[in-house]
């Protein structure tokens, strides 16, 4: 590639010098540069192609990430600095795409980056949501959901002339396709994220300040929102319509491209492999069978055999509520043809395996999507060693007994290019100086461990944390209106709001810490506890947890005895951009889900990679982090997954009995303290109090005492900064296992077999 001269580009595009350009015009200049460089990259073009189908792709802003992958980041940054410009300020003009919500979508984005970086032929396939999940706003210490209008001026979407017809039960719709380029780091080639949209979509269905809309107008609303509210029958139907629209387009695209590459479709499995990312794309199985039989004259039995050899399924959850189940009658309404094929597949599964526990359609005429994936896919993987073992031993045990050869573990990973180079350039520079630059492509950080007792390296590592905290404080002041003390310990829990992730347990700790400070026990360093995450609009208790956190934040800020020592912040509309500011600044990584409930987690990996110490239960990938760094470099607490499973199995967990312990009762009852209730919403606080006291399904009260003790030990250990930074270095040095390049290599070697 020719050398870049931003000065020449500025003169050509705007007739002025680079120094004279404002940040907005420089942003436009950089977008054009990246587009041209990316357009010049040919597509990966192997015989066999991966289609990674996912309801979510939480891709984040792409300008800096793509410059890193295209190999022009340092050159561009240096020229901008020389001209008096700040790339981070320029990036603020980029709007973050709203195509995902949490870990599922961010994992998919990291995977696409790694697939391209390894030079593999593989595209992501999903939907182009006009308003995303929603934009989160806070008012009256409560979450308000408004449309996330991100599509206005989008420079990353490239129109594709492909269009398909999707036939529903009593009407049809037409799709249109847009692509996002995915260049590979250090590669001359690229892949794409293929996003299907509804040609007839009508944004006018959505009032400006509400996410409520007419769910019955399927031909106009299908691609408006990610995960539309499914708390009523029409919402559940809309979800099914949306999922079928996604997979029908994906299947038609896959077949067309396979034929273009030379397939006669009898050999389709030699040309295409599908990775189903969670159960949302499951209907691609019957849809591929339908297309092969009705459009391409392949016999049904052969079509089933073909599809069985080309579809793989990733399970992301242990929660029964998240293993999708749909009424057969609803599927029949959306697509009678697909429902008929599902009935036939169920008959095949029942003929092969009589155990009713593994039926696709149960005695209540409910279709279990994961069961279809397992019977008619050739691979099933979990996403952390513990998660996969739980699937094999308990949650999916009947299937594991039938198909042990199908099951494997593929521990999740993250792309180091974004989460070090992009998010924490000071740390990237330190790593380059100390261990060389190969870590960007190899993911190998292990050489850093040789410097665990090197005073100079530890001091430089501490300096990178100081710099990251300064960037985070600036972000919080400008974007969130919050001032964070420069000497604060930064304690962070950022993830989707859900009872199993136990934000409510951290809230109980905050109450304990507040009361402890009121009693005169002042910490040596102020502690800032940062939350971030959205609650599903229909998930009442999660909304109540947000309200408790925001009310605690206000209560503590207004108490002059406590405010100098304890601060609670909840980031409004937490997204990838916020993550890139907060994660590098964190001292403590809160990974406190109830053991056995978190499949893997990826924020735990990002925090570890950036030198935060993990405070965790032995759940998901936390188990693997603990094994890698050793007990002395991580802080674990809580009941084990086996203990938790036993409590569920015998029904012996008694929240009410634990509540009666004086120390616990004090914390829970603080929520309904009359003065505190007067600050918040009485109904929300009373409901959450009663739920924790009487139900506590995810056992916050089981672990709260040990959690408080362990957390206080973490805060005490922070005071020995030499020992703390040594632990941080050991964590970074052992994070290489969690490179998504490693994960994708494993997927390819053991599942996809792409050349």
For the regions a protein language model found, what residue spans apply to each?
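A conserved ligand/cofactor-binding region detector
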Residues: 1-755
């Amino acid at each position: 590639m020719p050398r870049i001269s931003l000065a020449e580009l500025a003169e050509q595009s705007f007739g002025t010098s680079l120094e004279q350009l404002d940040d907005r015009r420089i942003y436009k200049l950089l977008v054009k540069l990246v587009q041209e460089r990316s357009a010049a990259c040919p597509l990966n073009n192997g015989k066999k192609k991966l289609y990674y189908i996912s309801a979510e792709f939480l891709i984040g802003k792409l300008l800096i990430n793509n410059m890193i992958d295209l190999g022009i980041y340092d050159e561009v940054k240096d020229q901008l600095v020389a001209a008096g410009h700040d790339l981070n300020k320029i990036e603020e003009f980029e709007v973050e795409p709203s195509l995902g919500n949490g870990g599922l979508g961010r994992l998919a984005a990291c995977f696409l980056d790694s697939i391209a970086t390894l030079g593999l032929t593989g595209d992501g396939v999903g939907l182009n949501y006009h308003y995303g999940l929603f934009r989160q706003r806070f008012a009256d210490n409560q979450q308000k959901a408004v449309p996330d209008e991100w599509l206005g001026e989008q420079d990353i979407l490239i129109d594709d002339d492909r269009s398909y017809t999707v036939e529903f039960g009593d009407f049809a719709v037409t799709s249109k396709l847009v692509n996002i380029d995915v260049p590979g780091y250090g590669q001359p080639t690229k892949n794409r994220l293929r996003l299907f949209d509804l040609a007839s979509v009508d944004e006018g269905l959505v009032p400006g300040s509400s996410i409520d809309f007419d769910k019955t107008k399927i031909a106009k609303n299908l691609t408006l929102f990610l995960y539309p509210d499914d708390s009523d029958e029409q919402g559940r139907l809309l979800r099914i319509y949306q999922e079928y629209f996604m997979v029908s387009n994906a299947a038609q695209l896959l077949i067309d491209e396979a034929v273009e590459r030379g397939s006669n479709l009898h050999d389709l499995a030699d040309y295409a492999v599908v990775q189903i990312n969670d159960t949302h794309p499951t209907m691609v199985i019957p849809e591929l069978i339908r297309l092969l039989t009705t459009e391409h004259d392949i016999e049904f039995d052969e079509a089933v055999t073909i599809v069985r050899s080309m579809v793989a399924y990733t399970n992301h959850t242990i929660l029964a509520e998240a293993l999708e189940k749909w009424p057969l009658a609803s599927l029949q309404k959306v697509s009678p043809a697909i429902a008929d094929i599902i009935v036939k597949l169920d008959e095949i599964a029942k003929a092969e395996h009589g155990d009713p526990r593994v039926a696709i359609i149960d005695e209540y005429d409910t279709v279990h999507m994961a069961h279809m994936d397992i019977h008619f896919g050739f691979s099933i993987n979990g996403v952390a060693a513990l998660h996969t073992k739980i699937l094999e031993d308990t949650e999916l045990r009947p299937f594991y007994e039938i198909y042990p050869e199908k099951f494997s573990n593929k521990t999740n990973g993250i792309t180091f290019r974004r989460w070090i180079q992009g998010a924490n350039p000071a740390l990237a520079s330190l790593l380059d100086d100390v261990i060389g630059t190969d870590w960007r492509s190899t993911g190998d950080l292990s050489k850093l461990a040789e410097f665990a007792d090197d005073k100079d390296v530890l001091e430089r590592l501490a300096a990178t944390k100081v710099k990251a905290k300064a960037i985070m404080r600036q972000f919080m002041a400008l974007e969130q209106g919050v001032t964070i003390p420069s000497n604060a310990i930064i304690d962070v829990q950022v993830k989707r709001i859900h009872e199993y992730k136990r934000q409510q347990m951290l809230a109980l700790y905050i109450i304990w810490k507040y009361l402890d400070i009121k009693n005169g026990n002042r910490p040596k360093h102020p502690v800032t506890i940062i939350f971030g995450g959205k609650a599903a609009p229909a998930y009442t208790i999660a909304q109540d947890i947000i309200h408790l956190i925001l009310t605690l934040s206000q209560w503590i800020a207004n108490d002059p005895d406590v405010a100098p020592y304890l601060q609670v912040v909840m980031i409004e509309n937490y997204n990838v951009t916020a993550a890139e500011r907060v994660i590098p600044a964190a001292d403590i990584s809160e990974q406190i889900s109830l053991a056995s409930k978190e499949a893997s987690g990826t924020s735990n990996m990002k925090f570890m990679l950036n030198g935060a110490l993990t405070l965790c239960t032995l759940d998901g990938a936390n188990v693997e982090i603990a094994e890698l760094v050793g007990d002395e470099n991580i802080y674990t607490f809580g009941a084990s997954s086996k203990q938790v499973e036993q409590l569920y199995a015998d029904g012996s967990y008694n929240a009410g009995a634990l509540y009666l312990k004086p120390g616990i009762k004090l914390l829970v009852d603080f929520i309904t303290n009359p003065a505190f209730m007067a600050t918040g919403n009485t109904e929300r606080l009373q409901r959450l109090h009663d739920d924790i006291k009487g139900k506590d399904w995810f056992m916050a009260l089981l672990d709260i005492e040990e959690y408080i003790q362990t957390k206080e030990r973490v805060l005490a250990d922070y005071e020995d900064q030499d020992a703390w930074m040594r632990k941080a270095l050991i964590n970074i040095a052992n994070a290489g296992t969690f490179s998504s390049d490693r994960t994708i290599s494993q997927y390819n070697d053991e599942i996809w077999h792409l050349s």
